[in-house]
Amino acid sequence: MSELDQLRQEAEQLKNQIRDARKACADATLSXITTNIDPVGRIQMRTRRTLRGHLAKIYAMHWGTDSRLLVSASQDGKLIIWDSYTTNKVHAIPLRSSWVMTCAYAPSGNYVACGGLDNICSIYNLKTREGNVRVSRELAGHTGYLSCCRFLNDNQIVTSSEDTTCALWDIETGQQTTTFTGHTGDVMSLSLAPDTRLFVSGACDASAKLWDVREGMCRQTFTGHESDINAICFFPNGNAFATGSDDATCRLFDLRADQELMTYSHDNIICGITSVSFSKSGRLLLAGYDDFNCNVWDALKADRAGVLAGHDNRVSCLGVTDDGMAVATGSWDSFLKIWN
């Protein structure tokens, strides 16, 4: 037996030990504890706005912290900043590469970022003296496509990539200050904790990992999905997070319990999940699916509480505003819809 086989066997044994230890700690289930809580009832949301302007599939969107402006990225090679109240376009930014897969709005509202198959995270300054939008930095260093990016502040951004790593960048210098390694498949999505000291990532190795931004360490690894994790989102209090996967389930993982608490699935749902987001309270989990719908789940009871149907193609991205008053969905049908 080769040394490699021995190590593989050892790793399997350790994994089983961890699984048993987690089982021993699981003295209760979330569904048992929440039996006395009233169900949320039927959630019916209406389309309040449709944002028309992109000419091709929308791949990503992100709300600004003002809960009014949002940025969207499409394969028409444009980044559009929208005013969701009026549906006006505040900026339409032509991109150097049209193969964009992610976009992000800085908390300050001064910058937006995007990236994709060019392996570069491009930072755009929205508040230049001349009033035009221009590239302020191009962050190159990943050796695979950029799948997700999120600003910590105006000078720091975290990115995830197909090259199996995440990275923290100093935007001023254009350098990676920390590289987060440990995944064994494309990293598809990341989500910052409310205090921005931690972030979680979901990958094609079917695992989610919790990282310490400052130390560059992987704190915890969460398994359970049976296929690629496409989407990940922190619970509003920062103690848990949800994932969406190609295995047609969403799952809730708890950082303190170090394990999965809940699975959100239905026999009728057989397609993958592209995006997940929590309501402001965390009671509702919204998930976008390949079957053109967005399902609303009762996060505590795992019941389907509603569905947002209105797109004519895959729902590729969604986001809830910081004030919790609206949700936006973006789709391959080239439209964004605002619901509440």
UniProtKB/Swiss-Prot annotation:
Lineage: superkingdom: Eukaryota
Alphabetically ordered keywords of this record: Acetylation, Phosphoprotein, Repeat, Transducer, WD repeat
Modified residues (N-acetylserine): 2
Entry keyword annotation includes Lipid biosynthesis: no
Keyword Phosphoprotein: yes
Gene3D superfamilies referenced in this protein's UniProt entry, alphabetically: YVTN repeat-like/Quinoprotein amine dehydrogenase (2.130.10.10)
WD repeats, residue ranges: 46-94, 95-140, 141-181, 182-223, 224-267, 268-309, 310-340
PTM per Swiss-Prot/TrEMBL: Phosphorylation at His-266 by NDKB contributes to G protein activation by increasing the high energetic phosphate transfer onto GDP.
Residue numbers bearing the Phosphohistidine modification: 266
GO BP, sorted A to Z: signal transduction
PROSITE patterns membership: WD_REPEATS_1, WD_REPEATS_2, WD_REPEATS_REGION
Phosphoserine: modified positions: 2
PANTHER family with a match to the protein in the record: GUANINE NUCLEOTIDE-BINDING PROTEIN BETA G PROTEIN BETA
Subunit structure: G proteins are composed of 3 units, alpha, beta and gamma. The heterodimer formed by GNB1 and GNG2 interacts with ARHGEF5. The heterodimer formed by GNB1 and GNG2 interacts with GRK2. Forms a complex with GNAO1 and GNG3. Interacts with ARHGEF18 and RASD2. Forms complexes with TAS2R14 and G-proteins; these complexes play a role in the perception of bitterness. Component of the TAS2R14-GNAI1 complex, consisting of TAS2R14, GNAI1, GNB1 and GNG2. Component of the TAS2R14-GNAT3 complex, consisting of TAS2R14, GNAT3, GNB1 and GNG2.
Family: Belongs to the WD repeat G protein beta family.
Function in brief: Guanine nucleotide-binding proteins (G proteins) are involved as a modulator or transducer in various transmembrane signaling systems. The beta and gamma chains are required for the GTPase activity, for replacement of GDP by GTP, and for G protein-effector interaction.
Designated name of the protein: Guanine nucleotide-binding protein G(I)/G(S)/G(T) subunit beta-1
Top-level taxonomy: Eukaryota, Metazoa, Chordata, Craniata, Vertebrata
